[in-house]
Design a protein with these regions (language model features):
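Interdomain helical linkers/hinges and coiled-coil/dimerization scaffolds
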Residues: 92-95, 99-146
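Receiver (REC) domain active-site loop signature in two-component systems and cognate sites
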Residues: 58
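Two-component/phosphorelay signaling modules centered on CheY-like receiver
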Residues: 11-32, 46
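Acidic, metal-coordinating helix/loop segments flanking the phosphotransfer/catalytic sites
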Residues: 33-51
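Alpha4 helix (beta4-alpha4-beta5 surface) of REC/receiver domains from two-component response regulators
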Residues: 41, 65, 86-101
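Active-site residues of response regulator receiver
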Residues: 8, 55
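Acidic catalytic/metal-coordinating carboxylates
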Residues: 36-39, 62-65, 83
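Short amphipathic alpha-helix used as the core "switch/output" element in two-component signaling
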Residues: 42, 64-75
């Protein structure tokens, strides 16, 4: 069972993600929510999620900085990015930091579920089955400003 943390500054969207998705059918359980990257880092310490679903543009700390800090701390949780940014540069930066998927908002019915299903299939092919948590991801060398 994947433990999910939902990170989104807009409360209606965050609650919609938590309530509208049939997480149990996906083999997941939502263990926490956060309204910005800083709250997310604290929630990661508290809940040890194996999957983080996050927005990019948030106050206090954005999703890319949160992801960068997670990786610097050795946290290899899977990350799915949800954002209104349609910039290839943002997608590329998130993927370089180990994000496993990138969905543009507004996303359509079933898109998030499909992203989670793709992740679970990748995990099954890798022999993880979703029960052991994420395997370490190979990470590129990052320079300031990346």
């Amino acid at each position: 069972m994947l433990k999910v943390l939902v990170v989104e500054d807009e409360e209606m969207i965050r609650k919609g993600i938590v309530l509208a998705v049939d997480w149990a059918a996906l083999g997941c359980v939502v263990v926490g929510e956060a309204a910005n990257g800083l709250q997310a880092l604290e929630a990661v310490e508290r809940y040890a999620p194996s999957l983080i679903i996050t927005d990019l543009k948030m106050p206090v700390m954005d999703g890319l900085e949160m992801l960068r800090q997670l990786r610097e701390r050795g946290n290899n949780a899977f990350v799915i990015i949800l954002t209104a940014y349609d910039s290839f540069a943002y997608a590329q930066a998130a993927l370089r930091l180990g994000a496993v998927d990138f969905l543009l908002k507004p996303f359509h019915d079933g898109e998030l579920e499909q992203a989670v299903t793709r992740l679970k299939q990748r995990m099954d092919r890798a022999g993880q089955g979703g029960e052991k948590g994420p395997a370490p991801l190979p990470l590129p060398e990052l320079k300031k400003g990346d």
